[in-house]
């Protein structure tokens, strides 16, 4: 990305993320990646870069966030995100316990998306939310406050 665009900011270069500046706007662009093991219920211990889109999509939180588009293939939806979007459903990619164990803040994201979009949470995903909610205690109060504040601000946008 840094070779394609003149103005970029290394916003998370260790995770393959740069912000491309176009005019007054910034767009985060992230290299396809595979997350290593999670040890703190928040961040992967290591990040491996890949050139396979499906591997990158597999690490996403919810099926509706695990879709991509390109001019050749058009919609890339290997996890049923469009079906869940059409059925107004929040569902984890793969095993919800694994997704929430990787990053406990995803629990709050599930609740936020459900409230914001008025989508129910799929039963297995909801069960994992209830089961793993105590893992939020491992997340700093500042991160939880930021997530809750973001949810509150977004609620007033609709």
Predicted regions and their residues:
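Catalytic cores of the polymerase beta-like nucleotidyltransferase superfamily
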Residues: 1-157
């Amino acid at each position: 990305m840094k070779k394609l665009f003149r103005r970029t900011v290394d916003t998370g270069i260790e995770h393959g993320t740069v912000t491309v500046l176009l005019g007054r706007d910034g767009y985060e662009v992230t290299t396809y990646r595979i997350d290593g093991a999670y040890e703190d219920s928040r961040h992967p211990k290591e990040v491996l870069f890949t050139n396979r889109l499906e591997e990158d999509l597999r690490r996403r939180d919810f099926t509706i966030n695990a879709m991509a588009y390109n001019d050749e293939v058009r919609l890339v939806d290997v996890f049923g995100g469009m079906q869940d979007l059409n059925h107004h459903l929040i569902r984890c990619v793969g095993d919800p316990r694994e997704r929430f164990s990787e990053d406990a803040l995803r629990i709050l994201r599930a609740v936020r998306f459900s409230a914001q979009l008025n989508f129910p949470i799929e039963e297995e995903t909801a069960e994992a939310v209830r089961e793993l909610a105590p893992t939020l205690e491992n997340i700093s109060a500042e991160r939880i406050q930021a997530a809750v504040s973001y949810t509150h601000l977004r609620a007033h946008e609709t």
